[in-house]
From Swiss-Prot:
Record-given protein name: Aldo-keto reductase Rv2971
Record-annotated membrane-spanning stretches: none
InterPro entries per the UniProt record, alphabetical: AKR, Aldo/ket_reductase_CS, NADP_OxRdtase_dom, NADP_OxRdtase_dom_sf
SUPFAM superfamilies: NAD(P)-linked oxidoreductase
Catalytic residues as annotated in Swiss-Prot or TrEMBL: 57 (proton donor)
Any further remark recorded for this protein: Identified as a multidrug-resistant tuberculosis (MDRTB) immunogenic protein.
Enzyme class: oxidoreductase
E.C. designation(s): 1.1.1.-
Lineage of the organism: Bacteria, Bacillati, Actinomycetota, Actinomycetes, Mycobacteriales
């Protein structure tokens, strides 16, 4: 990781296509348009530069409005959106990318992801081919996947010879994804975590709260720091400006190995989102 530390000055990580991405960003899943605009505005104001949305969230236009109103230069931003499952396919994925750009009011996205592999649908390889085209046309700087298994990624590489830059997956101490992180790394794919707080389920966990008290940090800050110290990039959602500021204040401390191990030891395979092996939605 490279870059300066600070309350919201997230370091950056270099992707396998040589583009760089902040290691910590704001997610806006399940936020209303008003909540999205307020959250994005608050995040940009404190120095956050990665904003993660998706067609399925229904708030790409709200993200675009907040970006336009912020005055932050486009080249300073890293904007991610995602391809919805009904839009999988070679041609439809390209059309969907252009439609997302229209809603965002942008000429390109920094990262375009296949939201779910949706194995029952059977179109994610075709969709990947279309995304390769979108990248070639300059509509997406980098392309990647979300919720993909190691086998899904190997299928893409074997059939298209193009490796995703990022695999965004559910990852928190209850689901530490050790094997998938190793598989991603073997293919030079950056692991980006979502639901790093397990939808709040870990905020009152005794192990988490005990460690937080030792560092005089919040449980959320400890959970985010754990994820970052594993070498992951992270997207964290919040609609509250004060919580957003707190979530980005995680670059001034480091967890000891014993505390990293204690948090990792909470792993029991619990998912708070759908199972990628069977899910065919979003």
């Amino acid at each position: 990781m490279t870059g300066e530390s600070g309350a919201a000055a997230a370091p950056s990580i270099t992707l396998n296509d040589e583009h760089t991405m902040p290691v910590l960003g704001l997610g806006v899943a399940e936020l209303s348009d008003d909540e999205t605009e307020r959250a994005v505005s608050a995040a940009l104001e404190i120095g956050c530069r990665l904003i993660d949305t998706a067609y399925a969230y229904g708030n790409e236009a709200a993200v675009g409005r907040a970006i336009a109103a912020s005055g932050v230069a486009r080249e300073e931003l890293f904007v991610t959106t995602k391809l919805a499952t009904p839009d999988q396919g070679f041609t439809r994925s390209q059309e969907a990318c252009r439609a997302s750009l229209d809603r965002l009011g942008l000429d390109y996205v920094d990262l375009y992801l296949i939201h779910w592999p949706a194995p029952p649908v059977g179109k994610y390889v075709d969709a990947w081919g279309g995304m390769i085209q979108s990248r070639g046309e300059g509509h997406a700087r980098s392309i990647g996947v979300s919720n993909f298994t190691a086998e899904n990624i190997e299928n893409l590489i074997d059939l298209t010879f193009v490796t995703p830059a990022v695999n965004q997956i559910e990852l928190h101490p209850l689901l530490n994804q050790d094997e998938l992180r190793k598989a991603n790394a073997q293919h030079t794919v950056v692991t980006q975590s979502y639901c790093p707080l397990a939808l709040g389920r870990l905020l009152d966990n005794p192990t988490v709260t005990s460690i937080a008290s030792e560092y005089v940090k919040t449980p959320a800050q400890v959970l985010l720091r754990w994820n970052l110290q594993l070498g992951n990039a992270v997207v964290v959602r919040s609609a509250r400006p004060e919580r957003i500021a707190s979530n980005f204040d995680v670059f001034d401390f480091e967890l000891a190995a014993e505390h990293m191990d204690a948090l990792g030891g909470l792993n029991d395979g619990t998912r708070v989102r759908e199972d990628p092996l069977t899910y065919a939605g979003t």
